[in-house]
Amino acid sequence: ATTKTLRILIDWEQGKVVWQQPRTPNATAEDWSKASHNLAYVKNYNLYITDNRGNQLQVSHDGSRELVYGQSVHRNEWGISKGTFWSPDGKSLAYYRMDQSMVTDYPQVDINNRIALCKPDKYPMAGMTSHEVSVGIYNVESRQTVWLDLGERKDHYFTGISWAPDNQSIYVTILNRRQNHDETWSFSALTGKRLQKIHEEDNEKYVQPQHPLLFLPWDDQKFLLQTENEGYDHLYLFDTKGNKLKDLT
């Protein structure tokens, strides 16, 4: 539970507060790990973590309106709704870094004030240069970031970020700019090295990756894949070597 000043963990069976932590004023995009009680958030364009002992760790230092950390990217397309992703043990944080310095401003009108205000937004018009996205992994214990080897095309779409249950690897779906081909790869969470392609989709019109992988709680070598690859939204059972084991729907 949260109040205006505190984040509180309550044991309902015992009827008492078992953990609490002060909230950071003006923090946005808060993402709390139930496993470690570490909290990620964005403030003044930079990404921070408050660990379970109350220490504030600054993950990024060069954030600005043009260089954005820990927030949703690609204009919330492809199932993207946030910019931080805790590992299952809550000790590592995957996050987006979006460089939009090359994107032109587009005028937006803010009508929340009595007199409307013009507030420019970074918006790439059709055919113009788009922003570039990277994915980093910050280790809370070492306080170091490694960057995933996503390839040379930083203007591709990167979505479906999902952690393996063992905290050692992470999965990302890479969608090309034409939006008709995607590949899902595993990466080392320790080095950022690209490990294995586990799934690929191709369509003459478009593909629509919308969902991260969902690992089975009782088998960390198998996961569910949700896709419209065959024309309708279906679930499939895969293993971590990329083998399709079963059509579930």
Question: Where are the regions that the model predicts?
Answer:
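Repeated scaffold domains used in trafficking and secretory/extracellular systems
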Residues: 27-31, 159, 208-214
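Beta-strand C-termini and the immediately following turn/loop, strongest in propeller blades
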Residues: 1-5, 37-46, 51, 82-85, ...
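Beta-propeller fold detector
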Residues: 19-22, 56-64, 146-149, 194-200, ...
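Predominantly five- to eight-bladed beta-propeller fold
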Residues: 4, 57-84, 95-147
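Short loop/turn segments that connect beta-strands within beta-propeller blades
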Residues: 12-15, 51-54, 139-143, 189-192, ...
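Short glycine-/Asp-/Thr-/Trp-enriched loop segments that recur within the blades
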Residues: 65-81, 153-158, 203-211
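Asp-box/WD-like beta-propeller blade repeats and closely related beta-sheet repeat scaffolds
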Residues: 4-83
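Beta-propeller and related beta-repeat scaffolds in trafficking/envelope systems
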Residues: 124-128, 153-154, 200-214, 249
